[in-house]
């Protein structure tokens, strides 16, 4: 029996999600940024999804961003926070997601951010 222990990185796709996505993976696969008909249908689906997520979270659709994955999401969140709130110091650990460490490292190398690392021991 195989046991998968990396659900923090990638999880199995829920069958309900797969069924909802099949049309967009097979027939309606247009680029939502394109101006042609297939692209516009894809754009409509993305916007409908944005409104659905916003409604579930009691948020504005303008506050919902879809990204390609953790790296892009982490970069947007960190860069936005650092710039918007004029963050000059970040505290993290060496166990943090690689994308977070790379983004913080880049800001540190550019002299825009001091980064401190908490020590990790057997208790966390």
Predicted regions and their residues:
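Pyridoxal 5′-phosphate
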Residues: 1-124
């Amino acid at each position: 029996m195989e046991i998968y222990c990396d659900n923090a990185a990638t999880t199995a796709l829920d069958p309900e999600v797969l069924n909802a996505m099949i049309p967009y993976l097979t027939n309606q696969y247009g680029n939502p940024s394109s101006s042609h008909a297939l692209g516009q249908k894809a754009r409509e689906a993305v916007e409908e999804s944005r409104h659905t997520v916003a409604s579930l979270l009691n948020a504005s659709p303008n506050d919902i961003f879809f990204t390609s994955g953790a790296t892009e999401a982490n970069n947007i969140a960190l860069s936005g926070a650092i710039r918007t709130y004029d963050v000059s110091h970040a505290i993290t650990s060496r166990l943090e997601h690689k994308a977070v460490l790379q983004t913080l490292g880049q800001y540190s190398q550019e002299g825009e951010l001091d980064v401190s690392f908490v020590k990790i021991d057997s208790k966390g």
